[in-house]
Amino acid sequence: MIMACHCTDCQTFSGAPFRAVVIMTRENITIDGDVSEYTKVAESGNERVQGFCGVCGTQVYAKAPDGSVYNVRTGFLEQHKSLVPVKHIFAKSKAPWIDVIENAIWHEAGPTSEQVKP
């Protein structure tokens, strides 16, 4: 299952209004390379092990302390554009403008400096 987490932890870690994750069990994951981990207490009160690429620091996953379930961050996956969340969690802390984002000005590529001046 793919979901978008709007908790304040995910907002802080990602620097974005939410973080998209795919929920997987350990036997369905293959990780190549070095992953650095640390454990923290999440907003939910649960302990979560955070996994980061040991080379570049990219967020790779969060997992339960027993390692049985992983929330794999979709942003670094090659197929991330096709991984559409079917569930949103922690709606109580979602950014209030998420509901109206389609009404904003969109650019097909990065705008020029002139276009983003206040």
List PLM regions with ranges.
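A short Gly-Trp-Pro
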Residues: 1-118
